[in-house]
Amino acid sequence: MKKIFIFGIGSLTGSKLAVLAKTRYHVSGSYNLRDPQIPNISSIHLDITNIEKVKKLLTENQPDFIVNTCAINNVDYCEKNQDVAKKINADFVSDLSRICQSIDSKLIHLSSDSVFDGTKKTSYVEDDLTNPINYYGLTKLLGEKSVLKTPENVVIRVSILYGWLPKQISNLQSSSMKPSNFGKWFIEKLMLNEKVKIITDEHSTPIIADDFARVILHSVEKNLKGLYHAAPHTKITRYDFCQKLAQKLGLNQDLIIPVTSKELGRDVMTGLNKCLDSNKMAKTGFQFMTLEESFSLLKQQIDKK
């Protein structure tokens, strides 16, 4: 049985991937804030900035595939804490890529639409010109370049990611003080009967974490190489996404307050077009879930909480 090691196994994507892959692979991983405590999966607390410990762990473990879900993805935090952002999003990724090459492990690294400036009129394809407009996007681009120096490696970009972890503490935040994921934050606000301001002028291609985990496992099993986008075919504004999700879950849609990104007063520039084109991934045989299918799955998971 081949081995998969997941950096960030306690994350939304990492834990979903671990559960999905454990019947076909020997899965283990490291976590920072929380141990997912998944049955039959070993996980270890690890400071990934201690690269010698990382190297020792991987050399002893000898995984066939290494998946890196670790990132500081709070755009405002990255702008104000550039040293920390670069250390996690770029420097660690560069070191990890070199370690993977030395032990002959394939690296699958997760990236973001933020490597683009968000001004294109249509969805971004993999070979579109990158032009990050904030420090987070710059660090993610640096990480991508390090990984892709090795042709066998894979980088998978994603736009808006959402999902549900039933054992999660409702107000759990990441190490950069960002809510665990946008979808869960939004749902819990409405469940508490709190109003939320949602922007109307940002378009994206949201993907549920369960489907994103399927994409990652697909890239392992198909031995994909290079750069791919993971994005369902639905392009939607964040406001319309929230309206549809609230309707599906039977939550009060009147609590959703429409605002423009300018009215929201963001501290850091972000692009308004976050849509990714995933035809390249689709041509490998992967079929993305529809938005309706994703919402139905999410509702099932919430009902089980």
Write out the residue ranges for each language-model feature.
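Active-site Tyr-X1-5-Lys
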Residues: 131-159, 184
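Mid/C-terminal beta-alpha module of Rossmann-like enzyme folds, strongest
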Residues: 199, 215-216, 222-267, 272-273
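NAD(P)-cofactor binding segment of oxidoreductase domains
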Residues: 80-108, 141
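Alpha-helical substrate-binding/gating segment
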Residues: 181-196, 202-230
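NAD(P)H-binding glycine-rich loop region in Rossmannoid oxidoreductase-like domains
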Residues: 48-88, 101
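Conserved C-terminal active-site "lid" loop/helix of NAD(P)H-dependent oxidoreductases
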Residues: 237-243, 260-298, 302-304
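Active-site "gating" loop of Rossmann-like NAD(P)-dependent oxidoreductase/epimerase domains
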Residues: 72-75, 80, 112-134, 164-166
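N-terminal Rossmann NAD(P)H-binding glycine-rich loop of SDR-like oxidoreductase domains
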Residues: 2-24
